[in-house]
Amino acid sequence: MKKALQVAMFSLFTVIGFNAQANEHHHETMSEAQPQVISATGVVKGVDLESKKITIHHDPIAAVNWPEMTMRFTITPQTKMSEIKTGDKVAFNFVQQGNLSLLQDIKVSQ
């Protein structure tokens, strides 16, 4: 009987130990997914630095399934706009964030 009691107690504590481990949560920092940076080319149709907008007639953009069209992009703080003017052919990168197309980088191209 004593042996049976020892086996029962051992089993009970083993089950409790495994259950405690199963309920332990590892609260590791989850990295947020980086937004997709999309590259495109087009022609600048207008620059409005006051409202932080640039209008570009861009070629089709397969990454977001967009046809060729003219649209406004939001100029972000890291965007260097010093040499960009209306009529320039440009290569640019942007991030789509909801309804906003956030310009990340833009360069005059040939």
Curated annotation (Swiss-Prot):
MF annotations from Gene Ontology: metal ion binding
Protein's cellular compartments: Periplasm
Primary subcellular site in the record, as a coarse category: periplasm
Pfam families membership: CusF_Ec
Domain of life the protein comes from: Bacteria
Gene Ontology CC terms: periplasmic space
Its job: Part of a cation efflux system that mediates resistance to copper and silver. Binds one copper per polypeptide.
Protein name according to UniProt: Cation efflux system protein CusF
Organism whose genome encodes this protein: Escherichia coli O6:H1 (strain CFT073 / ATCC 700928 / UPEC)
Gene that produces this protein: cusF
